[in-house]
Amino acid sequence: VIAAMRPDLEVILVESRKRRVDWLERAREGLALENCRVAGCRLEDVERIDAGTVSARAFAPLDRLLDLAGRFSTKTTDWVLPKGRSAAQEVQGLPKNRRKMFHVEQSRTDPDAGVVVGRGQWSAKP
């Protein structure tokens, strides 16, 4: 959706499962999304870039997701992480001095779900 709505942005979709990679590739080709690339590998194997936005859904617990994706972040990276019902609890589980980087927004599609939103650089070691 982002690649279709914002052709001025480079969008990289990371997915390690072959069937999903194939589906994403077909969708990308069918929609002629020139600005979209599918990386068919684990996040840990993706070449480091400076990401303007990091978004991930149902990937890993928040602390692990941040540690894995943090190497792509800069001081101006926006984080948009749909986390469902556990959003507030997962933010509270972060180290106190680092949780201030994030807040929880109400999901627009599920009244019981939250989206973790933040801005800034995350490193695995504080």
Residue spans of the language-model regions?
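Short amphipathic alpha-helical segments
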Residues: 25-26, 66-70, 91-94
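Conserved SAM/SAH cofactor-binding pocket of Class I
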Residues: 1-52, 66
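A conserved beta-strand element that flanks and buttresses the S-adenosyl-L-methionine
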Residues: 55
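Conserved beta-strand signature within the Rossmann-like core of class I S-adenosyl-L-methionine
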Residues: 75-89
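A short glycine-rich, Lys/Arg-flanked "PGG" loop and its adjoining helix->strand segment in the class I
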Residues: 63-79
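Active-site capping/gating segments
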Residues: 86-126
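Conserved beta-strand segments of alpha/beta enzyme cores
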Residues: 10, 35-37, 78, 100-103
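Short strand-turn motif at the edge of the Rossmann-like AdoMet-binding core
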Residues: 16, 59, 82-86
